[in-house]
């Protein structure tokens, strides 16, 4: 029952989270900082109450290590959300972030001196080609859609390039954080709920530097049209409703992934997360009518096939199916 519940939470939480994020970004493209702050604050308060036991429970991993991890996590979160301000469409944002495998492999080779099989290198090549196709076609759309003047078109393209640079930086930083996390867990053991709390609580003072931008967008949110929440009858500005739902759905998504990792094999987790990304992408394209050409579909297909190849899904599924047959023969 718990694995089925976890899968339901991941699909319901993560997919709807993307929807509310896009609703926010479409109305106010620069709202990344207030969204990040609200998400961090909610998870930090929840963790302080239920994980840290109101601050009475000492951390299993020393705070100095969390400080390093938090710096990376805070940077990745802010940069990823800020990239939406830089002419980056939500579908490209999702596809580009699927390139985490490439970043993990590159840094794994450089830092951990890892070596991989030809099969894995082939899968990474597929992911790279897929991301390149989607990025290249998106670049053409940015320049063609900016038809006001040559200067406007060039300016839009420059902002888009900065957005691609921001996503690339966040991708590499996220991979580096994953390697650092891996070494910490080997040394101190896995404490994922504790890490979730400290990764969101410790960066909160850093939002002081973004306070002006957060306040400006809070004012803009207050000026948005009023919306009555169905069934409750409470009326509030619709942008605050979108933000509230974004926070709740992100929490549901995170909890679903956590339950999934504790209840299911890594193969199941990989399959569910990969399928969830694909469903989110399809919904974003169809519901929000984001421009998506045949080339984008081809690039997306390359990314997801490469991801499944890298995680050796087909090999593992074949092994899983053959095991019951062997057991039956023994009996």
Swiss-Prot record:
<feature type="transmembrane region" description="Helical">
    <location>
        <begin position="4"/>
        <end position="24"/>
    </location>
</feature>
<keyword id="KW-1133">Transmembrane helix</keyword>
<keyword id="KW-0812">Transmembrane</keyword>
<feature type="transmembrane region" description="Helical">
    <location>
        <begin position="117"/>
        <end position="137"/>
    </location>
</feature>
<keyword id="KW-0813">Transport</keyword>
<feature type="transmembrane region" description="Helical">
    <location>
        <begin position="153"/>
        <end position="173"/>
    </location>
</feature>
<dbReference type="GO" id="GO:0005462">
    <property type="term" value="F:UDP-N-acetylglucosamine transmembrane transporter activity"/>
</dbReference>
<feature type="transmembrane region" description="Helical">
    <location>
        <begin position="59"/>
        <end position="79"/>
    </location>
</feature>
<comment type="similarity">
    <text>Belongs to the nucleotide-sugar transporter family. SLC35B subfamily.</text>
</comment>
<feature type="transmembrane region" description="Helical">
    <location>
        <begin position="92"/>
        <end position="112"/>
    </location>
</feature>
<keyword id="KW-0472">Membrane</keyword>
<feature type="transmembrane region" description="Helical">
    <location>
        <begin position="30"/>
        <end position="50"/>
    </location>
</feature>
<dbReference type="InterPro" id="IPR013657">
    <property type="entry name" value="SCL35B1-4/HUT1"/>
</dbReference>
<feature type="transmembrane region" description="Helical">
    <location>
        <begin position="291"/>
        <end position="311"/>
    </location>
</feature>
<comment type="function">
    <text>Antiporter that transports nucleotide sugars across the endoplasmic reticulum (ER) membrane in exchange for another nucleotide sugar. May couple UDP-alpha-D-glucuronate (UDP-GlcA) or UDP-alpha-D-xylose (UDP-Xyl) efflux to UDP-alpha-D-glucuronate (UDP-GlcA) influx into the ER lumen, which in turn stimulates glucuronidation and excretion of endobiotics and xenobiotics.</text>
</comment>
<feature type="transmembrane region" description="Helical">
    <location>
        <begin position="229"/>
        <end position="249"/>
    </location>
</feature>
<keyword id="KW-0256">Endoplasmic reticulum</keyword>
<dbReference type="Pfam" id="PF08449">
    <property type="entry name" value="UAA"/>
</dbReference>
<protein>
    <recommendedName>
        <fullName>Nucleotide sugar transporter SLC35B4</fullName>
    </recommendedName>
</protein>
<feature type="short sequence motif" description="Mediates endoplasmic reticulum retention">
    <location>
        <begin position="326"/>
        <end position="331"/>
    </location>
</feature>
<dbReference type="GO" id="GO:0005464">
    <property type="term" value="F:UDP-xylose transmembrane transporter activity"/>
</dbReference>
<feature type="transmembrane region" description="Helical">
    <location>
        <begin position="201"/>
        <end position="221"/>
    </location>
</feature>
<feature type="transmembrane region" description="Helical">
    <location>
        <begin position="251"/>
        <end position="267"/>
    </location>
</feature>
<dbReference type="GO" id="GO:0000139">
    <property type="term" value="C:Golgi membrane"/>
</dbReference>
<feature type="transmembrane region" description="Helical">
    <location>
        <begin position="268"/>
        <end position="288"/>
    </location>
</feature>
<dbReference type="GO" id="GO:0005789">
    <property type="term" value="C:endoplasmic reticulum membrane"/>
</dbReference>
<keyword id="KW-0762">Sugar transport</keyword>
């Amino acid at each position: 029952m718990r694995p089925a519940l976890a899968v339901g939470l991941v699909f319901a939480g993560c997919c709807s989270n993307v929807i509310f994020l896009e609703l926010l970004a479409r109305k106010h493209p620069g709202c990344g900082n207030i969204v990040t702050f609200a998400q961090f604050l909610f998870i930090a308060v929840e963790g302080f109450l239920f994980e840290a036991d109101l601050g009475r429970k000492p951390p299993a991993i020393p705070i100095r290590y969390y400080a390093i991890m938090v710096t990376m996590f805070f940077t990745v979160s802010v940069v990823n959300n800020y990239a939406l301000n830089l002419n980056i469409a939500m579908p490209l944002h999702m596809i580009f972030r699927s390139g985490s495998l490439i970043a993990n492999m590159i840094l794994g080779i450089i830092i951990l001196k890892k070596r991989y099989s030809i099969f894995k290198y082939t899968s990474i090549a597929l992911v790279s080609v897929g991301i390149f196709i989607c990025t290249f076609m998106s670049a053409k759309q940015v320049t063609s859609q900016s038809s006001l003047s040559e200067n406007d078109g060039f300016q839009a393209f420059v902002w888009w390039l900065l957005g691609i640079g921001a996503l690339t930086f966040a991708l590499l930083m996220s991979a580096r954080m994953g390697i650092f996390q891996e070494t910490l867990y080997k040394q101190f053991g896995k404490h994922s709920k504790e890490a979730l709390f400290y990764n969101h609580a410790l960066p909160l003072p850093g939002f002081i530097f973004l306070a002006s931008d957060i306040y400006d967008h809070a004012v803009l949110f207050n000026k948005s049209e009023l919306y009555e929440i169905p069934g409750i009858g409470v009326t509030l500005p619709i942008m605050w409703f979108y933000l509230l739902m974004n926070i709740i759905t992100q929490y549901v998504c995170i909890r679903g992934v956590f339950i999934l990792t504790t209840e299911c094999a890594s193969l199941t987790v990989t399959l569910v997360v990969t399928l969830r990304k694909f469903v989110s992408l399809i919904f974003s394209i169809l519901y929000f009518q984001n421009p998506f050409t045949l080339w984008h579909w081809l690039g997306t297909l390359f990314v997801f096939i490469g991801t499944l190849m890298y995680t050796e899904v087909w090999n593992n599924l074949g092994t899983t199916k053959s095991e019951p047959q062997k057991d039956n023969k023994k009996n």
